[in-house]
Each structure stands twice: as C-alpha cells, then as structure tokens.
C-alpha cells in the first residue's frame, strides 16, 4: 500500500464501500517509507502514517498489515496470507504461525508497486553488492548503511537518488558509474559517464570495483559496498493468474499488466508502470473512482497531496560482457553464460530457457532475474524482448507454509468414522 494504494483506499472509504487494504509490510506506505521527498510539505513517511490513521477511523475499512495477496482465483476470490507470529521471537500462545484468508470481492485494485532489477557483471555475487533501492531503504528507513564508502552502478536516474540520499546521511560516495554517456553530472560525487563495472575485488567481502571508461581505460574504485540499479519491473504477477499475457512497455523497458487479466481487477501506481509519486496518486484515485461508480457508489473528487512528478530517465542495459561468471539468478546460480549455452543447445523459447537453466524457478519466481535472461535471449536470437515473450506466473506470489493451507477440517473432521446401521 504505497501512494497509489493509500489514495485508492481513501477514495473507497469515503464512498461507504466495504474496504480491505492488505499490505505485506508491517508498516503501510510502500516506497514512501524509504524515500526522503515530501508530500504536502511533510515527509512521505508522515503522510503515509496520517493517511493510515485516517483510514483506521472508518468503520467500513479493514487494514491487514503483514498480509500478502498470494493468488487471484475465479469469481473475484483472492487468497491472502497473514503472517501472525513469524516476526515474533516467542510466538503468542494459541496463535497460528500464518492464516490463509479467502476474500470475496466485487471489485479489486492492485497497487503492488515495482521491483528493482539488477545489472549482471563479472563477480557480482560478492558480499556487499546489493540493489541500490534496497540500500536506500536501509539508510532512510533503518539508519543502516552496508559501508561508509559506497559506489553506485546504474543505467537510470533512480540510482543517483541513492547516491544523493546516502551522501546527505554522511556516507562517502566513491563514485557513480552510469552507463549513459549523457548521465547527469553532480557536485556531490564523481560521475563516470559511459562507464561499466567489469569486475569486483575482495576476499571476504567487497573492497573495490574495476570500472571501464569510454576512452578504453580502466579505473579502480575503493568501496565497501556497491548499489546496482538496472531499472524497475512492475509487480504484475496477480494479473497473470488467469493466464493473461503481460504487455511490453518501451518507455520503462518492462512488462506491464495484460489486457485480459482477472475480471474485476484494476491496476494502479508503479504496478501499472507509473513510476512518479504524482502519477501513482492520480492513478490510484482514478481507478478506485471508476470501480466504485461501476458498483453504484457515489464518490467525491479526491484531494491529493502535492508530490514530486519527475520522470526517471533510463537507458535499457542488462549485462556487461565478460569472460567469467556473471549471475542473473543468484538463488538458483544461473549465469549469463548459462543463457548463452541454452541458445547454443537450441533452447530458444522462454519455456525451454526456463527449464534448461532453472531461471526464474527459485522461490522468488524470477522477480529480479527474468528480465535479464529474456534480454540476453532476445539479443542472441535477433529478436526484441516482446517477441521473445515471457512466462507467466502462478500462485502463490510468495512462499507459503503448507500448514496455512491445511484448513479447519482435519483429523476426524476431515475423514469421519463411518458406522453401519447395526452400530
């Protein structure tokens, strides 16, 4: 429940409709909890908190934190997994670990945000290398930094946001390596425009990175952590649970929700490909208003906060050419070389690629790795990424304990003893 979800929930709450707002985080707000920009002259964190408090005041609203919508099923039914005691050191007596809810809806709105994707390069599995957005979240939300000297490798403006935020918190920025020749310059840190990270160094953790520059020379940047940003992918998984095929969007170089998604499901915010805060707020309020009016509810024009609306510029870039291993899927140890070998073995469809390499078959279902693999296969086959296509997703959206599916009919209630009339 980021800006789109909160804006949509507020519109729905004021209409009188029965509303359930589910968020997998314990603190609603989405990326607002990890950013430093303001809404209506207050921090994004404070705006999210005040909005949640307002939603709590409505009798027709049910807030469900620590709850993930894990599947979209027939007739507007959704499965929701509530984590009751996973976060507790000592679980509460008589409380389950997780609860599986079945939610029956007339209309639903997906505001699941987006997931940052990496760039593959040699030895990118060394401790200290992480996504730039995650690094920003640790710093802004938890006041934690992986190192006092950080470098950034990016193909988009969002990577620079991480450098700016870390610099403001007193972290030394060793440099921002931006693959774009027209990368924005900065007075706060050095920008290596047109550069690429070609190797990393360090025995027990990252100590430095090797960077190639446009003039053909190499440089070594000393750093204890490297933030990587290759762009963002909308979280569209639920929209494909009814076999809908994602649609490619050139503007963000990512797949967006299918036209033939689950009936009654609308999408807003970053999940729709709108990556600005202003765009997320507007799309959330708009989609909620349209859904409510279709159900016969009267709505008022949403009063939205002023927010930043700068579009993040990005140049698609998926991997750095090299000789040694560059990981795409770090959970299943799938490398760039594995995808190339798959092509050499004549496995050219995405379904064959997935099964030959196990790309995207880990518990995250390829949330960070699939796009890189598809881009490499497209390059090898001389096709575009939408021509190569993508596999679709299935429930559950996140790993779920088998016990949550057990239900209430167990033991004798599941298989009662049958007796003959003589008994």
Give residue spans per PLM region.
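Residues forming the flavin
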Residues: 1-423
